[in-house]
Every structure is written in C-alpha cells, then in structure tokens.
Amino acid sequence: MMIKPTRPRRALFAAVAAAALGVLGLTAAPAAAQEWRGWNIHAADYPNGVGMDAFTRIVAERTNNRIRMRTFHSAQLGQQDEAIQQMRLGTIDFANFNLSPFNNLAPSTNVVTLPFLFRDVGHMQRAIDGPAGEAIARDLENIGIIALAWYDAGARSLYTTRAVRTPADLRGMKIRVQTSDLWIDLMRALGANPTPLPFGEVFTSLQSGVIDGAENNWPSYESTRHFEVARFYSTTEHSNVPEVLAVSRQRWQRLNEADRAILRDAARESAAIQRRSWAEREQVSRQRVTAAGVTVIEITDRAPWSALMEPVYAKYAADARLAALVRQIRELR
C-alpha cells in the first residue's frame, strides 16, 4: 500500500524543490522594467540633448533595457523652474539643468555663477570636476537632487537690440536674466534693468520690446534664433556656468548599488560626449550668426566690467565656506 506524505512532509518536499530550482536560476523572476521620464530645455540635436541621449542609451544597454529612459526635449514638461520642482517631488526622474536657477536653493551654486571667476573653459572643468562639483553635489542632495555629472554650457555674453561696447552702454537697458537673485544683482551692477523671464519667452519679449537684450552662449543664441531679433552680440564672457546631469533623490533611493554605479558611469561618459559636442557646436553657431549678418562686438578688455562686480562678490561669497571655495577655484592651475 502506498503511503501518502503527510502535510508537513509535502510542504518540506515543495520547499526543497523550490530551493533546487532557485539554485538553478529557474524560478528567478526578471526584475520589472523601470520607465523613467527626463527633462531637457533644449532640442534633441543640441549638445545637451546629444549628451542626454547618450546617457539613456548607455543605461539601457548596461541594464538590458531594465531601466528605460525617455527624455522629453525642448521643455515639453515645462520651463526649468517648474522642472526643478517636479524633480524634487519625484515626478521627473532625471534632467539636465543649468545651475543658476538653484542659486536661491543651493548656496554653493552661487560660487560657479559668480562673474569673471573662471579664466577659461579648462579652468571651469577642473573646478566643477573637483572641489566645486563636490560642494554643489552635497547642496543639491539636500534639496532632493542627485548630481551625476557636469556638462559644459559655454561662456555667456550679452546680445542686444543696440550696440553695447562698454558698461555705460547698458545703462537703463532691460536685460533678461534667469530667476536668481545673483543674476539680478549682477545685471544691476552693470547698470542695466534686470528682467527675470523664462527662457521660452525671450524671443517674443525681444520682438515686442519688453526687453532690450539677454545674455547666453553662442549655441543658445543661434539655436533659438534670438539673433533674428537681437542683432548685436558683445563678447563679455561674463559667466561660464556649468550644468548638471541629475536624477531625483526619490528615484535614486530605490536603486541598488549596482544600478547606481551603472548610472554614474553612464553619466560621466555622456559628459565627455556632451563636452566634445559643445566645443564643435560653439564654432558652428558663431559662424552661422556671423553669416546671418549679426554684429559681433569683441570685448578684449574686461577689466572695466569685472571691476563693477565687487558688490556681487561681497554679497554672494561672504560666507566663510563659499569664500574658501572661491579661493580654491582661483588657485586651481
């Protein structure tokens, strides 16, 4: 007569069988695919878009499509201030941001926004890949944003509806600035009337006379076609603010260490791609706007401009920690 196993013995057999299958890897369910939403203010073919698309591609490849990222280019998910808030809430998972809009949220971002701080692009990259980047990453994490890598954003210069050769020429002109107290004070120190506006409103505001000018790098001036309505570009190169490739802290906290390492590596690789693309695009953009008849005013002596920035430094680098960071950056070789 066949003896049926008792209930405890049947449970034991089932557990042993399950363990055996687990050893063979036969019962391991695949991890659920993650769908990430990303924000970018620029078009997909802009250097930042190229960098972000490289980032998402590398992550997909190294996770076997377990982490799938979709970047919404051209500010489809809102303007930058809105996108920052969405990332802090966790409704945007990753993004490329300019650091200036963080000036009122993350104190160390004020340092890299300070005018005439960097000698050249190489100096800026050494600073942001070193002490400045470390300080900013800590401050950003405190507000819910995890910095993974740093992108170039070029030297920012003035473009206006009439010629500007000296600070005196700016007096009384309405110049668009980013939403940042530092930028407002910077432009006011130059004698202009700072006008905070979303980036997406600059073209129509120039066209209608709401503002007399703005400031940005060559690729932004060209890609947005601002050169059609502001025909003078003065190479003040007053600022060289880097940008951050970041993820939401809420999303980051749900990742294991292996996936975090994949994202960090992918971000660094994407930054190298973005920086190469940026250097190439700067040259092309300058050639395009020059060919379109823009008057380029070369500012070779920036001393009269930088001399006006003392009150800005006194206000935004007065804190001992920030003053020390400014010194570190200036001493970098």
Regions found by a protein language model. Name each.
Residues 1-9:
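N-terminal secretory signal peptides that target proteins for export/translocation
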Residues 26-33:
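Sec/Tat signal peptide C-region and signal peptidase I cleavage site
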Residues 10-14, 29:
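Hydrophobic, aromatic-enriched, well-ordered structural segments
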Residues 14-25:
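Bacterial N-terminal signal peptides
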Residues 3, 24-25, 110:
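Residue-level detector of alpha-helical hydrophobic segments embedded in or interacting with membranes
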Residues 16-17, 34-123, 131-333:
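N-terminal secretory/targeting leader peptides
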